[in-house]
């Protein structure tokens, strides 16, 4: 499959998904991945059949762990070394100290898969992950890491995107492994989908084609409905924020609403994602260097729309409503201006302080609309501020909430999912920075505390009494450095796993 067919016959490039299996042995694998663990007596190999280890050591003329260390292997999480293995290859990957946790296993499996993919040399490989997984949960985590580690940015060339790895087999005899393996497959597929969307060039992925691709992703899912509001429907509905941001582009904006409503569900989770398919900054135009990666500014919408597909496929017993607020922020004669006053969906008037602070504007319309679904918990997620990146770096996302209960719920879900968040406050002093002399509120203010200021703005559009969390994923959503563990370059799909885990917690 070369791509996802969308409404205008454009194909969005996608990454092929490897097959996923569980087996008691690694027979037939081109590459075997095992662990290097730091035990009380020094490094040891974790996984691999004892007979195979014995035969290999007879060939090497030394203990396998010694051979690995001499070749550059290490127990450091994610480090890899490749050795010959019965005519094929063995990847030994560092797992840390004995008794390592789930996230260490996920990272190690991802690192092993990336190292295995580098051995393909144009052919698709069958890979076995034999890391001593003894429980069904460990099987799921190892499978997640390995599948996510297989991902590479889809190419747009005359040749197809053939996968370096065609099959991933988790070696384990754990009881109940197959259902957990299916969970891993569904979750990885959702992360792949979010990555595919983020990686797609903005001339291929714009509001109309993004919406069409979401419809394809959600097609034929039980208890799922998809509604797309185009420019005319947005005008009739009073979505002034989305229309203002998208007004400068030849590609008109969209609001995508996806609802998953399983019979018998008693709780509702609302998800709102920023979907700026390209952010030039508008009339407050970005520099060339800061504009190049701005196809990624729809990472929040990608996360919520991919996540709801996974939630439905998992059959979780919770009602979920996801909103993708889609627009392209471009400068033109029809674009909005600094100092414009925009009337939002809920009637709030907003003075535009900077056309490059557009994400909060589309999100505000989405939040106000989502509150009408009477959710028990509402989460918005966006690549919102450079200020959050300055504060927390490229691997940690910021979370700001309505209170301790919402923060604890979100952080528990993120920890279980293996995604790193850090809570920031919203202070009264920060809120004062939103004052406008001519409108109800101003969209932006001082640079200091910019992440908190944006969160304070968004909270104005959340109905009091609803638990709310704002996730600023500007740092970890897009990787401009080298690939590491299960994280590829470019789109990471960050946030998908946390949102799915949150839904699972709410489903009980």
From Swiss-Prot:
Mn(2+) 1 binds at residues 279, 356, 358. One of its GO terms (cellular component) is cytoplasm. Its EC number is 3.4.11.1, 3.4.11.10. It catalyses: Release of an N-terminal amino acid, Xaa-|-Yaa-, in which Xaa is preferably Leu, but may be other amino acids including Pro although not Arg or Lys, and Yaa may be Pro. Amino acid amides and methyl esters are also readily hydrolyzed, but rates on arylamides are exceedingly low; Release of an N-terminal amino acid, preferentially leucine, but not glutamic or aspartic acids. Mn(2+) 2 binds at residues 274, 279, 297, 358. Keywords: Aminopeptidase, Cytoplasm, Hydrolase, Manganese, Metal-binding, Protease. Its cofactor is Mn(2+). The keyword NADP does not apply. Binds 2 manganese ions per subunit. It is an enzyme of class 3 (hydrolase). It comes from the Bacteria. It is found in: Cytoplasm. GO terms for biological process: proteolysis. The active site is at residues 286, 360. One of its GO terms (molecular function) is manganese ion binding. CDD domains: Peptidase_M17. InterPro entries: Leucine_aapep/pepB, Macro_dom-like, Peptidase_M17_C, Peptidase_M17_leu_NH2_pept, Peptidase_M17_N. The keyword Cell wall biogenesis/degradation does not apply. It holds the Pfam family Peptidase_M17_N. Belongs to the peptidase M17 family. Presumably involved in the processing and regular turnover of intracellular proteins. Catalyzes the removal of unsubstituted N-terminal amino acids from various peptides. NCBIfam families: PRK00913.1-2 (NF002073). HAMAP family: Cytosol_peptidase_M17 (MF_00181). This is Probable cytosol aminopeptidase. The lineage of its organism: Bacteria, Bacillati, Actinomycetota, Actinomycetes, Propionibacteriales. The gene is pepA.
